[in-house]
């Protein structure tokens, strides 16, 4: 693993590069797109393991923090959906230069999957876009976070304006507006690459997205791999999720070890 900073020197992004550990490097590389806030914390260990397994399979892998998150530059209230999608594009270009490849696959979890799907509509250098338990509709996603926070705080308050705290992380009005506009059912087809949705359980929102893509004749491979997927839960111990079956399934998908 090689930690480093990249992108704009005045607002650098923090990344960890995993070089290929197999004898022969693959011709494509992989960018991992994290979820946000408490889901980031729950997923960090899983992403690290996924990156290691992919590097052992011969991929160059980059996992990174969006602007205003983790160890990247920016205050925690400075980012928004537009900036985070731009960060993914920056990470793609950085990995292509670092690994010397022309094609990159994206693996995104939760909001990271939603952002990856948006980026894919604009890129012609993608091989696969793996949407792992994606946030299909942003409005109910945000509403659930806000209601849960209100319940935990033991009081109701107007959260329609300004910045509120979500598990210790700021949710600004700009962030909220961007997240609420997410609706993968209206997704523009990827400009390149194959789109794959890998889900831990068959929630109604996942099935609705699959059916919407089928109705619009947008290619989507749908895989249900039963495993833990309660990313939005967090306890006082900061427990991580490490769903081995779905991690192995994503590796198999990217290495063509699964039958399409």
Task: Explain the meaning of each model-derived region.
Residues 69-103:
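Catalytic nucleophile-loop/oxyanion-hole region of alpha/beta-hydrolase
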